[in-house]
Each structure stands twice: as C-alpha cells, then as structure tokens.
C-alpha cells in the first residue's frame, strides 16, 4: 500500500476514572461500541485476543491527516484528567518519539489514539474518517500497535506469527494467498530477521521479539504504527539497532511511526519529531526546536546533568 496518513491531535484530554480504574477496563465492559471498539475483538479471528496487539490498518488513498479532535477520556462515575488540551502532529515518513516522566500519560495517550480506550468528547479522524464510526475490521486496516506485553504464542514460528498480520485480509479461515505469503516474506526481510523465520517464538530474545512484532505490523500494511516503549528491557546496542530500524522504516516506507520511550538521549538523536508530555501539556516539535525553547532542560531538571542544545547530547557532571 502506498497511502500516507498523518496523526494530528487537537484539544485531546486523556485520563483515568476517579476510582483508579483504567478507562480501557471500563471500555471493555461498555455496550456503547460507537465510542470506541476494542481492537482485540478483531484479533479473535487470528487467535491473538490474549495479546492486546492491534492488527494493522490499511488506510484510504489520500495524503490527508489523521486528526484526533477534542478527545476526553471520561467515565460515567467521573474521571481524573492526566493530560488535557493536547495538540500535536505526526507526519508520514517521520519517526516521532513520545517522551515524558512516569505517570504523565504516555501509554494512556497511545491507547487512546489506538481506540483501546474510549473517547467521549471529540473525535479521532484518519483522513476524513472519524474512527468512532469505523467498524473494527476497517480500523484494523488503518493502524497497528505494538504493546509491551509479549504474546503467548510460544509454539508458533516467527513466520507464522508475522503472517497473523494478514488477518484483516484473509477472512474468517485465515488462509494465505500467494500474495499474502509474498508480503509476509517481504516484511520479514525488511526487518532483517530472515535467518530466524523458522525459529519458535519461545526461543526469541526481547530484542528479537520486538523486531518480529514490527514485521507483523508491516505485514498488516498500515500507514500508522504505534509502539509503547519498544526499547524497554533491551541492552544499549539493542536500543540503538531498534531505533535505527524504525527510523529507516519511517523514511523508506513512508510510515507514520509514533512510539513512547524513556530513552531521552536516543530519542533526541534518532527522532524526526518529539512529543513531550509534561505538566499535563504536550509539546510538539523537532528535537532542536524543543531544545531551543527550553523544554528539554525543564524535562531533565537536574543540576547534575548538562544538556548540550547544539549536539543534543547529555552529560552527567
């Protein structure tokens, strides 16, 4: 697929219920599917319901933005806002890193964008489409998400797991056509995991597993890929390799890739744009733009650390 779509947030508010219940839990029990259908429903056809991993979504043929307009994460019993009035843009062909301290709402924001949590005030647009009006199968062709949890498919081979990315296109029985198999092989090659295609998933390291899940998203052929802390639990070389891989995929395949991370310096060096969540607000810009505006210094907030705005490097004093 050659379509390109951007993400735009307009006046977005995310949060939790006042009683500490995560809104995704409330949403799963809700009968109001028009306010956000949990994409795990789509995964039931591909034996992935336990994973919480989205199937990719194939977007419409246009270059218009995905706009997320005036979203509020609310619960009938009330909600506590984590971050409000968020405005930001992620473009095709760019790697955007979402950074922020623990508890600022990074994962909540990603889950809201992916419609794993309900939206009540406002809408999410992909191109001209409000995602609340889309069927799960339509949504599963527009956006994919890789979460931190490891899928419990230990007896599958890598190729079989990647092939699940074709579920939105194969119908109920999940039979792969010759074209589906070609797309799966290409996705495996693009991520550089051809040598492990026949390995069992249970033998993979964390870094290898992340690459497999990225290949699965590529096989799903979505314009947008979301990743929640993909570099967590990886060693330093593994973090660099994975970030450079995502950067290359964004640039070469014109994907809109948005990921959350705590690895500030790696994000500064590899991201095209940053979304910085701080004090309930979202700051959007290139690494140099946010550095020049003083947001990176404020985010670090330590006298024992020196941040160089020109080189975007961090030094412990």
Question: What would you call each of these model-derived segments?
Answer:
Residues 99-101:
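The feature captures the beta-strand-to-loop junction immediately N-terminal to the Walker
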Residues 300-317:
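ABC ATPase nucleotide-binding domains
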Residues 225-228:
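Catalytic Walker B motif of ABC-type/P-loop ATPase nucleotide-binding domains
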Residues 261-262:
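H-loop/switch region of ABC-family ATPase nucleotide-binding domains
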Residues 114:
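Helix-to-loop junction immediately C-terminal to a conserved catalytic motif
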Residues 200-204:
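Conserved ABC ATPase signature
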Residues 122-130, 139:
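Conserved ABC transporter NBD signature motif
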């Amino acid at each position: 697929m050659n379509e390109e779509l951007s993400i735009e947030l307009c006046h977005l508010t995310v949060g939790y219920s006042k009683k500490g219940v995560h809104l995704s839990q409330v949403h799963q029990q809700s009968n109001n599917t028009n306010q956000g259908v949990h994409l795990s429903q789509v995964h039931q056809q591909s034996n992935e319901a336990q994973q919480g991993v989205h199937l990719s979504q194939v977007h419409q043929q246009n270059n218009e933005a995905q706009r997320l307009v005036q979203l509020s994460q609310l619960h009938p019993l009330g909600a506590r806002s984590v971050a409000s009035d968020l405005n930001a843009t992620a473009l095709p062909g760019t790697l955007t890193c979402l950074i922020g301290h623990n508890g600022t709402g990074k994962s909540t924001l990603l889950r809201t964008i992916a419609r794993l949590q309900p939206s009540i005030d406002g809408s999410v647009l992909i191109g001209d489409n409000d995602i609340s009006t889309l069927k799960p199968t339509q949504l599963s062709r527009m956006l994919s998400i890789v979460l931190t949890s490891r899928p419990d498919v230990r007896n599958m081979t890598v190729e079989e797991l990647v092939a699940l990315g074709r579920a939105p296109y194969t119908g109920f029985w999940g039979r792969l056509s010759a074209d589906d198999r070609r797309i799966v092989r290409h996705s495996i090659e693009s991520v550089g995991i051809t040598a492990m295609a026949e390995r069992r998933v249970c033998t993979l390291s964390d870094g290898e597993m992340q690459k497999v899940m990225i290949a699965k998203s590529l096989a799903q052929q979505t314009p947008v890929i979301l990743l929640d802390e993909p570099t967590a639990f990886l060693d330093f070389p593994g973090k660099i390799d994975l970030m450079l891989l995502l950067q290359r995929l964004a640039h070469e395949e014109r994907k809109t890739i948005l990921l959350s991370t705590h690895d500030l310096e790696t994000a500064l060096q590899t991201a095209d744009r940053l979304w910085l969540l701080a004090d309930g607000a979202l700051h959007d810009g290139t690494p140099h733009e946010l550095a020049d505006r003083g947001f990176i210094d404020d985010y670090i907030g330590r006298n024992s650390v020196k941040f160089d705005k020109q080189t975007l490097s961090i030094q412990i004093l």
